[in-house]
Amino acid sequence: MKGREYEDLAARYLKSKGYQILGRNLRSPYGEIDILAEFEGRKVIVEVKGSETFFPAEKVTPHKLSKIIRTAYEVLGEEPFSIEVVVVYRGKVYHYKDLGLEL
């Protein structure tokens, strides 16, 4: 699988859980938002990581989260949002909702 395929799988998974996909690959000078969604009336920034050889959750570093947050503020302004991570590892989806980041 390649990056786009991981994001496609993540988007299908999120839709199956009731998320509305609002945008994908949204860029700012600070970085990129893989998926912008809405769930139960709130905006959700979803970072997608995938790998077939190692569990990729370690790629979501504090530096990466900082870039995601700056990009989210650039895209959403002052609108509240949360950040979630979807990891695709060997074809299985892992969804991390509660990162303690309700901004």
From Swiss-Prot:
Query: Which Pfam family would be a valid example here?
Result: UPF0102
InterPro entries found in the cross-reference section: Restrct_endonuc-II-like (IPR011335), tRNA_endonuc-like_dom_sf (IPR011856), UPF0102_YraN-like (IPR003509)
Q: Which domain of life is it from?
A: Bacteria
Q: Listed GO molecular functions? A: nucleic acid binding
Show the PANTHER family listed in the entry. UPF0102 PROTEIN YRAN
Family per similarity comment: Belongs to the UPF0102 family.
**Protein name (Swiss-Prot/TrEMBL):** UPF0102 protein aq_041
